[in-house]
C-alpha cells in the first residue's frame, strides 16, 4: 500500500471516531 493511502485511511478513521465520540 502507498503511504498516502495509509494516511488517508488513518484520517478517515480518526474523523469517524471523532464524530462517534462527539455524539456521545
From Swiss-Prot:
The keyword Nucleotidyltransferase does not apply. The chain crosses the membrane at residues 4-24. The keyword Transmembrane applies. It is a single-pass membrane protein. Residues 1-3 are cytoplasmic. Induction: Constitutively expressed, induced by thiol oxidant diamide, slightly at 45 degrees and slightly at pH 5.5 Celsius (at protein level). Its main location: membrane. It is found in: Cell inner membrane. GO terms for cellular component: plasma membrane. Keywords: Cell inner membrane, Cell membrane, Membrane, Stress response, Transmembrane, Transmembrane helix. NCBIfam families: PRK14760.1 (NF011343). This is Uncharacterized protein YoaJ. It comes from Escherichia coli (strain K12).
Amino acid at each position: 500500500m502507498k503511504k498516502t493511502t495509509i494516511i488517508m485511511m488513518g484520517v478517515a478513521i480518526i474523523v469517524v471516531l471523532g464524530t462517534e465520540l462527539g455524539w456521545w
